[in-house]
């Protein structure tokens, strides 16, 4: 999927990385009794590449969330960076390519439409190690980039909306489960 989104040298690098990683994964799968994946969909993608003799060893797990930690009635810390105006939040590691792609896409394609209706709204991008492309989004009207925060829960619980506009990642994202829990 990454290769399909890129051009030129980056496309070649992602495609080559996929090919090498696939060879390695196939070799490792043959050496173990079971292979576990983060979702049934991910397991199916891998299973479909395997010889029939290896397919029964491949299993998908379901994501979960700590419902005690992400309890809407629980207490969480005061977080000084939580906007005082209505806001939309995105949470995640902001040096992970799929998250970077998601917030850039949202900022370009969706955020201007929201600002037309709610000029005072804030898009709060929450997560450690924001890339330079993510930091640059803070120059746009209504976009705040927090970087790493002590407690992500206030940014989820107090948001009018939590978005996960992932264009690439497969499976259920933990950020979605956390938002639904709160």
List each model region and its residues.
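Short glycine-rich, flexible loops that bind phosphorylated cofactors or substrates
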Residues: 44, 97, 170-171
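Acceptor-binding helix/loop patch of EC 2.4 sugar-transfer enzymes
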Residues: 1-23
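Conserved catalytic-core segment of nucleotide-activated headgroup transferases in glycan assembly
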Residues: 30, 48, 55-158
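A short, active-site helix/loop in glycosyltransferases that binds the activated sugar's phosphate group
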Residues: 22, 26-57
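Glycine-rich, N-terminal phosphate-binding loop of Rossmann-like dinucleotide-binding domains
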Residues: 39, 92, 166
């Amino acid at each position: 999927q990454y290769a399909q989104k890129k051009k030129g040298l980056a496309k070649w690098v992602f495609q080559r990385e996929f090919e090498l990683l696939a060879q390695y994964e196939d070799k490792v799968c043959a050496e173990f009794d079971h292979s576990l994946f983060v979702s049934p969909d991910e397991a199916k993608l891998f299973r479909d590449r395997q010889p029939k003799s290896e397919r029964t060893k491949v299993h998908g797990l379901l994501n979960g969330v700590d419902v005690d930690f992400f309890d809407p009635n629980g207490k969480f810390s005061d977080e000084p960076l939580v906007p005082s105006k209505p806001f939309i939040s995105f949470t995640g590691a902001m040096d992970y390519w799929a998250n970077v792609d998601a917030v850039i896409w949202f900022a370009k394609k969706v955020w201007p439409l929201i600002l037309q209706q709610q000029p005072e709204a804030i898009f709060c991008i929450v997560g450690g190690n924001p890339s330079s492309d993510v930091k640059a989004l803070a120059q746009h009207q209504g976009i705040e980039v927090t970087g790493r925060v002590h407690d992500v829960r206030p940014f989820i619980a107090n948001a009018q909306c939590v978005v996960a506009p992932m264009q690439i990642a497969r499976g259920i994202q933990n950020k979605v489960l956390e938002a639904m829990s709160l």
